[in-house]
Swiss-Prot record:
Belongs to the WD repeat DDB2/WDR76 family. This is DNA damage-binding protein 2. Keywords: Acetylation, Chromosome, DNA damage, DNA repair, DNA-binding, Nucleus, Phosphoprotein, Repeat, Ubl conjugation, Ubl conjugation pathway, WD repeat. GO terms for cellular component: cell junction; Cul4B-RING E3 ubiquitin ligase complex; nucleoplasm; nucleus; site of DNA damage. Residues 333-335 are annotated as: Photolesion recognition. WD repeats lie at residues 115-150, 158-193, 202-237, 243-286, 289-328, 342-385, 395-419. The modification Phosphoserine is found at S26. A motif (DWD box) lies at residues 255-273. The gene is DDB2. GO terms for molecular function: damaged DNA binding; protein-containing complex binding; ubiquitin-protein transferase activity. The lineage of its organism: Eukaryota, Metazoa, Chordata, Craniata, Vertebrata. Residues 1-11 have a biased composition (Basic and acidic residues). It comes from Bos taurus (Bovine). One of its GO terms (biological process) is DNA repair. Residues 1-33 are annotated as: Disordered. It comes from the Eukaryota.
Length: 426
């Protein structure tokens, strides 16, 4: 399908650097601001429930852990096992979240942001796609103007993005325009890997394996296509009854593929043995349509996000065992970018945006639209990030490969979180 050009009326990307505050404000000091941002629920008054701040404050200050230096010394002496050392490092990171602030914002799009990808080797560079097909390449570590690639407008939504692991000056995209393609930073199309040639079929997801040199992409009618890096199609099969919302290759066993769908299933496949739609290794039924399925960085777990109120964590060596269930409000809404939970790249932590639901079992009267951090082992909520000046729903939240900077998508806006001192230096 030939790309359509869009009128030259796109606004200039807006990037805002947040100045360092003189001191950290307590939740009590923020309470008057939060009152203005709360949505009045059925039968509720405009009075803000101060008990919510008390609960949030208790989450915002994790208990102190033992000295990391001591833990490293004990590990060196052989008196501390690696898991305990890893747990100590994770707790230290959780403690640092109290200092995280939004230090940069960008609002470059005229339609909401729909996808997000971090550069694999430049920890201050990310790519963000929009519903209009626009793409922003932003290195927030320098003062240069971000690179803006204009899309086609309506019908051009970027549904998936990934930097090319073989050449990080290029990136893959899947889109509602009906293509999965490889582009450079100037917006030139280097190769079209898949094209529907019809407006009724579009691509919703993609992933890339550098080891196997393959690209996998899924469409809105249930097909999954596997191609090599030269663009040659290896197979094209209908693996689901409905839209394939997410495809993910295991980072350690790159022949292991997970596909998620609005048909309320996640399926696990061995790429070496795919013969047809029934050749999956495991089918993991869900109660609701599924937005995403992410393997953990070590490949040992699978994280799924449905379109209602459930996050699941499966063990990759025990697919038949019941998963860990994490109740969490993130319901689907037509004009909201689907909420997807993601892994922290270094610790067994899950990060996901909250969409308060009055019908959710544990919903508070004036619940905030926070970014929630869960322990991947216990399912316990460990921390909640919140900025009253950016109180919208954070649909996408991903840490950079270093694990020290968080990018969030909130409607039209891109937000970058970092420890306050580090953010000021950046």
């Amino acid at each position: 399908m030939a790309p359509r050009k869009r009128p030259e009326n796109q606004k200039t990307p807006e990037v805002v650097v947040r100045p360092k505050s003189k001191r950290n404000r307590s939740p009590r000091e923020l309470e008057p601001e939060a009152k203005k941002l709360c949505v009045k629920g059925p039968g509720s008054s405009r009075r803000f429930d101060s008990g919510l701040w008390a609960g949030l404050a208790s989450l915002r200050v994790p208990p102190l852990c033992s000295s990391i230096v001591r833990a490293l010394h004990q590990h060196k002496l052989g008196t501390a096992a690696w898991p305990s050392l890893q747990q100590g490092l994770q707790q230290s990171f959780l403690n640092s979240l109290a200092s995280y602030r939004i230090f940069q914002k960008a609002a470059p799009f005229d339609r909401r942001a729909t996808s997000l990808a971090w550069h694999p080797t430049h920890p201050s560079t990310l790519a963000v796609g929009s519903k209009g097909g626009d793409i922003l390449l932003w290195n927030f570590g320098i003062k240069d103007k971000p690179t803006f690639i204009k899309g086609i407008g309506a019908g051009g939504s970027i549904t998936g993005m990934k930097f090319n692991p073989l050449n990080t000056n290029q990136f893959f995209t899947s889109s509602m325009e009906g293509t999965t393609r490889l582009q450079d930073f100037k917006g030139n199309t280097l190769r079209v890997f898949a094209s529907s040639d019809t407006c009724n079929v579009w691509f919703c997801s993609l992933d890339v394996s550098v080891k196997s040199r393959v690209v996998v992409t899924g469409d809105n009618v249930g097909h999954v296509i596997l191609l090599n890096m030269d663009g040659r199609e290896l197979w094209n099969l209908r693996m689901h009854k409905k839209k394939v919302t997410h495809v993910a290759l295991n980072p350690c066993c790159d022949w292991l593929l997970a596909t998620a769908s609005v048909d309320q299933t996640v399926k696990i496949w061995d790429l070496r043995q795919v013969r047809g739609k029934s050749s999956f290794l495991h089918s993991l039924p869900h109660r609701h349509p599924v937005n995403a399925a992410h393997f953990s960085p070590d490949g040992a777990q699978l994280l799924t996000t449905d379109q209602k109120s459930e996050i699941r964590v499966y063990s990759a060596c025990q697919w038949d065992c019941p998963p860990s269930l994490i109740p969490h409000p993130h319901r689907h809404f037509q004009h909201l970018t689907p909420i997807k939970a993601s892994w922290h790249p270094r610790y067994n932590l899950i990060v996901v945006g909250r969409y308060p639901d009055p019908n959710f079992k544990s919903c508070s009267p004036h619940e905030l639209r926070t970014i929630d951090v869960f322990d991947g082992s216990s399912g316990k909520i460990m921390y909640q990030l919140y900025d009253p000046e950016s109180s919208g729903i954070m649909s996408l939240n991903e840490f950079n490969p270093m694990g020290d900077t968080l990018a969030s998508v909130m409607g039209y806006h891109i937000l970058v979180w970092s420890p306050e001192d580090a953010g000021t230096q950046k």
